[in-house]
């Protein structure tokens, strides 16, 4: 069943939940049923979504009968965990009776291969919208979760996202990632702009936001661990300085402006330090800066070029790129700069390391033929795995907060894409596409204000 054994018991709990970040109230019934989405044997979870029915005979906004299930299907599909069954030819669901509480035809849904069913309904009064969602376990023939959301019509997308996050939490034990954004740079000729896009933007095509612009280059966006700031390098004043800005675009401030190259690496897990690549003392070396005081301390000392530093999740080690061996390779050192050791030996060009938030693995890009591909390697140097394939340049990997997905940029055929990769199944989806050059994607932490 889904390639793994499903939980045998279901503990039903009744609770009332108030959504602090949302203008509607939730009532829920939920149970613990975990499916191992990290198993090599994992198969997508077969799920069906029924048309939604008007509640209590409310016939207003009939288009929502198809809008809600369509949005639920798109949102489930974005996770990469579900096999959404085509409802064509499926059983006549509760929308034919007008009673959202009616029992689904479990046997008929099961004959279509469904293991779970989502059904629901809606009603409206003036500008207020009420939506119900229910998750049914078809195999066990019982309801696992029921939620009701109340808000404005502009909140219906957020209602769908919040419910799917609850489904993910219940079935997989994960938190989901719709409350995250991905920052990336768009180049148009000589000018550049920094943008963010919400992970759920494909649901209805919205949620792309411009953060900052420059008539020259912007490089290396980096999220602070609390999601309040983006650090990046820009040539807006004639040389590569480091700036910080809020994701809304306010509070732009220059924080590093040494002579020569200034590039941000990564914020420390506690947000107190920022790794840097500076050339103020000659060649490019790795430094760490105290964010409050602005004081910097040098970590590497050699004649090579050292760039792209990132922290381990516990803040005790740093991965970076150095050409000290003659070609760019990934190295690891202690947070104080000691105990440097080479990590990658396969390939003659490996760069842009990204340490998984779960620990254990580092993603990076490596040159293969005339293009670049994304790889992962265990933090001890073993188990090298190529994660992408195909023509073009696959670059700038960045992990999702749960460490199960990667975002990266792909340049191929005159188009640029910001893609999402499932690190287990290797399934790839496109989040954003343009004829302009898109690069340097950076995945945010979970954002408290994310459900917009």
Swiss-Prot record:
Q: Which residues form the signal peptide?
A: 1-31
Alphabetical GO biological process terms: cell division; protein import
Pfam families the UniProt entry points to: PD40, TolB_N
InterPro entries in UniProt: 6-blade_b-propeller_TolB-like (IPR011042), PD40 (IPR011659), Tol-Pal_TolB (IPR014167), TolB_N (IPR007195)
Location in the cell reads:
Periplasm
What's an example GO cellular component term for this entry? periplasmic space
* Domain of life assignment: Bacteria
Q: Which UniProt keywords apply?
A: Cell cycle, Cell division, Periplasm, Signal
Q: Quick check: keyword Membrane in the entry?
A: no
User: What's the family?
Assistant: Belongs to the TolB family.
Oligomer and partners? The Tol-Pal system is composed of five core proteins: the inner membrane proteins TolA, TolQ and TolR, the periplasmic protein TolB and the outer membrane protein Pal. They form a network linking the inner and outer membranes and the peptidoglycan layer.
- Role, per record: Part of the Tol-Pal system, which plays a role in outer membrane invagination during cell division and is important for maintaining outer membrane integrity.
Q: What is this protein called?
A: Tol-Pal system protein TolB
- Its gene is tolB
């Amino acid at each position: 069943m889904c390639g793994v054994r499903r939980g045998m018991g279901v503990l039903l709990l009744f609770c009332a939940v108030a959504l602090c970040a949302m203008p509607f109230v939730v009532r829920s019934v939920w149970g613990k049923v975990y499916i191992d989405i990290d198993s090599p044997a994992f198969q997508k979870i077969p799920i069906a979504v029924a048309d939604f029915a008007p509640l209590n005979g409310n016939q207003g906004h009939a288009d929502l009968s198809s809008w809600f299930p369509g949005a639920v299907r798109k949102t489930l599909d974005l996770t990469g965990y579900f096999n959404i069954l085509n409802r064509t030819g499926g059983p006549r669901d509760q929308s034919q009776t007008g009673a959202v509480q009616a029992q689904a035809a479990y046997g008929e849904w099961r004959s279509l291969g469904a293991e779970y069913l989502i059904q629901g309904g809606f009603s409206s009064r003036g500008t207020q919208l009420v939506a119900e969602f229910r998750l049914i376990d078809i195999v066990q023939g019982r309801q696992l979760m029921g939620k009701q959301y109340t808000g404005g019509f502009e909140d219906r997308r957020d209602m769908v996202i919040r419910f799917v996050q609850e489904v993910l939490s219940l079935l997989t034990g994960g938190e989901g990632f719709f409350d995250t954004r991905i920052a990336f740079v768009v180049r148009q000729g000589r000018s550049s702009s920094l943008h963010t896009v919400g992970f759920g933007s494909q649901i209805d095509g919205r949620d792309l936001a411009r953060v900052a612009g420059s008539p020259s280059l912007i490089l290396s966006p980096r999220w602070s661990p609390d999601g309040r700031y983006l650090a990046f390098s820009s040539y807006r004043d004639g040389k590569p300085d480091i700036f910080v800005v809020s994701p809304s675009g306010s509070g732009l401030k220059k924080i590093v402006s040494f002579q020569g190259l200034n590039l941000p690496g990564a914020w420390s897990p506690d947000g107190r330090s920022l790794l840097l690549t500076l050339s103020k003392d000659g060649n490019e070396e790795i430094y760490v800066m105290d964010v409050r005081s602005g004081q910097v301390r040098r970590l590497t000392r050699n004649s090579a070029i050292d760039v792209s530093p990132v922290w381990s999740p516990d803040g005790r080690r740093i991965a970076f790129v150095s050409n000290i061996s003659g070609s760019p390779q990934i190295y690891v050192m202690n947070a104080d700069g000691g105990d440097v050791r080479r990590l990658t030996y396969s390939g003659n060009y490996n760069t842009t390391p990204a340490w998984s938030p779960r620990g254990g693995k580092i993603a990076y890009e490596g040159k293969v033929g005339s293009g670049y591909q994304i790889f992962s390697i265990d933090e001890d140097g073993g188990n090298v795995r190529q994660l992408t394939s195909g023509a073009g340049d696959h670059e700038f990997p960045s992990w999702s907060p749960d460490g199960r997905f990667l975002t990266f940029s792909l340049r191929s055929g005159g188009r640029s894409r910001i893609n999402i990769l499932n690190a287990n199944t290797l399934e790839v989806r496109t989040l954003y596409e343009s004829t302009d050059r898109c690069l340097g994607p950076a995945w945010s932490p979970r954002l408290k204000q994310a459900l917009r």
